[in-house]
Amino acid sequence: YSENPVFDVDKTVADVNIDMVGRVDKKYEDNPNYIYVIGSDRLSTDLHKINENANNTYAGLTLDYKYNDEKDPNRYYFRSDHYNFARLGIPSIFFFNGVHEDYHQPGDTVDKINFDKMQNVGRLIFHTIWDLANRNDRIVVDGKVKAGR
């Protein structure tokens, strides 16, 4: 999309990437009320604050920034769909439940989804997007694009 956009990318305020948000990884087996957040602060501290505020007000999830670390060997920030927007300077946020034993396997079936968790993550995402869409001003881009390849 970013190479052949339907809408001018200069009018794109942010990208929200939702990829695998209904499962629980090993770290959180005893507390599935979490989500990994990647990229929210890389190009816009406003985007990061909006998401934190939405979480504190509406969802109460543990926001884990483990995979947002620039030194993370998984480099998820550079590997998922949102990066095609981020490389153009569009602030991006990526919601991710982490990897599990069925990651990219046929055994990743609907019966393994934690629907209560997914509902709460959806609530967070809704309120983050609601705030982005209803602001009087665009969020400030105050970070620099870094090459990922």
Question: What kind of feature is each model-predicted range?
Answer:
Residues 96-149:
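His/Asp/Glu-rich mid-to-C-terminal helical/loop segments that flank catalytic regions of hydrolases
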Residues 1-92:
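Metal-dependent peptidase/peptidase-like ectodomains
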